Amino acid sequence: MYKSLLFCLKIFVFLILVGCGITAYIIYHYSRDLPDYSQLARYYPPSVTRIYSRDGKLMEEYAFERRVFVPINSVPSSLIESFIAAEDKNFYNHPGVDLFGIVRAAFLNISNYLHHRRMEGASTITQQVVKNFLLTNEVSLERKIKEAILSYMISRVFTKDQILELYLNQTFFGRGAYGVAVAAQNYFNKSVEELTIAESAFIAALPKAPSELNPERNYARVKARRDYVITRMFEDGYITRDAAKEAMDSPIVLRKRAKEETVTADYYAAQVREEVIRMLNSKEVFYTGGLTIITSLDAKMQQLAENSLRKGLREFDRRCGFRKPIANISLDNWQGELKKLPTPPSLLEYKLAVVLDVADNHVEIGLIDGSKSKMPIAEMKWARSNFKSVKTLLKKGDVIVVEAIKEGYALRQIPEVNGAIMVMNPNTGQVLASVGGYDFSTSKFDRVTQALRQPGSLSKTFVYLAALENGVKPNQIFNDGPIEISQGPGMPSWRPKNYEGKFLGEITMRTGLEKSRNLITVRVATAVGLTKIVDIIKRFGINNEPKKVYSMVLGSIETTLSRMTNAYAIIANGGKKVEPHFVELIKDRNGKIIYRRDDRECLACNVSDSNLDTAILEIPKEYIYRVTDEASDYQITSFLTGAIDRGTGYAAKKLGKIIGGKTGTSNDSKDTWFVGFTPKIVVGSYVGYDTPKELGKRATGSNVVLPIFIDFMSNAYKDKPSLPFKVPDSIKLIAVDSATGKITPGGTVIEAFKVNNVQMLENEDMIDNQDNNDIFDYVPSKEDQSQEIY
């Protein structure tokens, strides 16, 4: 008996030794080519880059993997306990591999197999870290062995908190969310610190099947999985019975990010993306670096700019008349047929409808949701001039675009024309709003920065400015009559015309710009010379290499809305160089500032909120680079404010603000523009077809684009004070007759003369012979409503 026991013991010891030897060999064999796990100590996961408006609203997120790194000491204990209960009960006690868990799972899975239940896994959190970081998802014995070896080795080198930090930040939770921080934001619009026990349990339940555990598709299954995690938390002693019951009784309510926390600015965000990638010289850093980018964007102005542009494009498109229905379908199953139709691009808030019945003064329409409504003829009047019966416009089965209004629905169509709008601070160059087209989802081409178009009359401003720089006085008389320009041997003479083909005769230079007279502009250009005009176009950044031809003075050069708006920003700020910029600040994933647009002292920091709108934050002199002298700049500003009060921008006068501005219309009305400004804001807008063609015989900047500016300013600037443009010491204000240009105390316009020219004026025949010693010391009274000062 004793010998038998001894023999069995020897066999047992031998088998143990053999087993240990085999185990040692396996460990040695598979340890030779293990990946380097020391890299985990240098964990910098790909993280989402977020772009914000200047008032902290989220504009856009960019990432290969949407992740925000959160350190373990910022993760609440309830969330950690949820994962421990759900994934690895013995996490704090085992050495990376849970042998007891493996045995338990093996016996449990026998029962699960017999009862057709889901199999239990025994993979620890450490093993999942190894699989996610160091190995592939290959299902093989070799991978499992390597996984176990690495898990043990990692547990000896890294603390449990370090392993948890890796796991919680790397794991995929569905809906494009990597890591618990983005999961909390995606599902509940909360930070991890704000999660309840029930919400923590929900997130901890996701890694098992993140794509399948969707409460919007399978609520019962998701709730059962969440409640299982809560039960485990109670059984493991993390929460009380009452807390568990309360958590299980709570419904799963997903919450999206609140609308007021975000701003839609797709074109702006795309411009920021390109700008930052250029700055960093790395697309990878942008998409993986977890950057926080603060921009110049004003969320309110951005929304208003987008609304104004879309409204203006739609109104112009409707003026061109109704094109045709989208399709014609059978009414037998009209709802089903309507659903089959592809959604037209750029439908936005509009809806598709089918005409069910047609009467003389209304139509009955059906919508995709099966509802019906009547649309009166009054909401279709724009479609065709002087039509009296709807039957001449639409028929049964026609598929049309409609817009919901208070009284029902109105006939609409998606504009074919496109355009852009840009809003700048002229003193800092901050781009406050930028909308590069009607709909970003349909066309990502940015018409603010990418579209090269002819500015038409917008370029006239710089012809007149060149004249003022070179000593031509603002009351100089020019002849608004026919002119012929020689273009050299073998070339036909150039005979420019005014827009409407009429002549005004002898008028002042000011009136020439205010009324946008082509022939006056050409005569001013001949007086100054093309060389100086080319120079000023370059200086203001409108075009770097303009062709030295006379047609350029009427706008035949090409430029972008961004360049042209910036050129007018220089005028608005008194002639100082400024460049448009979108990005204010960039922080890396750790909050370290890696870029700041301006390191100068914050000039606005000591200005109270109540005074901010009236404060003009000037650039310190050591930072100033002048593009033009302040006297000439003030003179052209005075001309441009006159264009609003008496000229082509007159419609904007109803805004009740001191505004300068200029319309622009290119040859054949292919491009229409308007740029308007105050001392604090510059707004540029453009409308035209992407493939240039005539907008219409009577289409001009005044009737196509100026309404966009007016709509924007009436909403964005209605509560702002009207600020005057600062009169420099080098300017003398003198009353003149706007018709003759002669200086007179009873003049209808207060003209801005350079101080060094005033003495010369006394010797010229431009002064009415009146006995008035104060003619050159005019100080207007507030009561004098007939004279205007800018």
Swiss-Prot record:
Catalytic-site annotation from UniProt:
87, 457
Write out the pathway annotation from the protein's UniProt entry: Cell wall biogenesis; peptidoglycan biosynthesis
Q: Name one GO cellular component term.
A: plasma membrane
A GO BP entry: response to antibiotic
Keywords, A to Z, come to:
Antibiotic resistance, Carboxypeptidase, Cell inner membrane, Cell membrane, Cell shape, Cell wall biogenesis/degradation, Glycosyltransferase, Hydrolase, Membrane, Multifunctional enzyme, Peptidoglycan synthesis, Protease, Signal-anchor, Transferase, Transmembrane, Transmembrane helix
Q: Where in the cell is it found?
A: Cell inner membrane
The transmembrane residues are: 7-27
Q: What is its EC number?
A: 2.4.99.28, 3.4.16.4
Which SUPFAM superfamilies does the annotation name?
beta-lactamase/transpeptidase-like, Lysozyme-like
Topological domain, Cytoplasmic: which ranges?
1-6
Q: Does the keyword Transferase apply?
A: yes
State one molecular function term (GO). Answer: serine-type D-Ala-D-Ala carboxypeptidase activity
Reaction(s) catalysed by this chain's protein? [GlcNAc-(1->4)-Mur2Ac(oyl-L-Ala-gamma-D-Glu-L-Lys-D-Ala-D-Ala)](n)-di-trans,octa-cis-undecaprenyl diphosphate + beta-D-GlcNAc-(1->4)-Mur2Ac(oyl-L-Ala-gamma-D-Glu-L-Lys-D-Ala-D-Ala)-di-trans,octa-cis-undecaprenyl diphosphate = [GlcNAc-(1->4)-Mur2Ac(oyl-L-Ala-gamma-D-Glu-L-Lys-D-Ala-D-Ala)](n+1)-di-trans,octa-cis-undecaprenyl diphosphate + di-trans,octa-cis-undecaprenyl diphosphate + H(+); Preferential cleavage: (Ac)2-L-Lys-D-Ala-|-D-Ala. Also transpeptidation of peptidyl-alanyl moieties that are N-acyl substituents of D-alanine
Stated membrane topology is: Single-pass type II membrane protein
Enumerate the PANTHER family for this protein.
Answer: BINDING PROTEIN TRANSPEPTIDASE, PUTATIVE-RELATED, PENICILLIN-BINDING PROTEIN 1A
Q: Which family does it belong to?
A: In the N-terminal section; belongs to the glycosyltransferase 51 family.
What is the name attached to this protein's record?
Penicillin-binding protein 1A
Which organism encodes this protein? Rickettsia conorii (strain ATCC VR-613 / Malish 7)
